[in-house]
Amino acid sequence: MERIEGVAVGRCAASPYLVPLTLHYRQNGAQKSWDFMKTHDSVTILMFNSSRRSLVLVKQFRPAVYAGEVERLFPGSLAAAEQDRPQALQAALPGSAGVTYELCAGLLDQPGLSLEEVACKEAWEECGYRLAPSDLRRVTSYKSGVGLTGSSQTMFYAEVTDAQRGSPGGGLAEEGELIEVVHLPLDGARTFADDPDVPKTLGVIFGISWFFSCVAPGLGLQ
């Protein structure tokens, strides 16, 4: 996963995942504009494996995180994107700079599937757990990337067991996914969430906090 080679950066051509746009509007009599990205809404799934007394997370390399770290440590590195062709990054970092811990998640990019159906599909593809929509508890929905995408994300919760795991998961190779499933023991989950040196999404932090506040007491877990 962390073996990253031949890193180059270039302009984004036509993409099925995002479209850069500018919204022009008048607010309180003042003409304004705002650049944003049109993208898909998404779902996330927080799973608790009662067989292992652990929370199920995923770990994967995120190119955007990697590029952001390169630019943060070596300002101006992404200026190569102004070129017509992808240009090799002169300042590169180990692949670990782009690896993050996340909740199982997926885009709502398949018309006809409900939020619950997409969540179940992702739980199987990424983590290898068989879920039915009836297994899911809807936690909440919220806006993400409010300054850039304004997309909506819905979080679900599901309790699973080892008996429901029918494959190792790992994502779809044909879609470029390379995912490691992580079973986070409950006794170290709070420390994990609070550690600023562990690269993780806000969804992981919120999910762990929500679990201990809303689920653990009912299961007799502390």
From Swiss-Prot:
Keyword Chloroplast: no
Entries under InterPro entries matching the protein: NDP_pyrophosphatase, NUDIX_hydrolase-like_dom_sf, NUDIX_hydrolase_dom
Catalytic activity as recorded in UniProt: UDP-sugar + H2O = UMP + alpha-D-aldose 1-phosphate
Entry keyword annotation includes Cytoplasm: yes
EC number(s) given by UniProt: 3.6.1.45
Motif position, Nudix box: 111-129
Subcellular location: Cytoplasm
BP GO annotations: nucleoside phosphate metabolic process; ribose phosphate metabolic process
Function noted in UniProt: Hydrolyzes UDP-glucose to glucose 1-phosphate and UMP and ADP-ribose to ribose 5-phosphate and AMP. The physiological substrate is probably UDP-glucose. Poor activity on other substrates such as ADP-glucose, CDP-glucose, GDP-glucose and GDP-mannose.
Protein name in the entry: Uridine diphosphate glucose pyrophosphatase NUDT14
Species name: Bos taurus (Bovine)
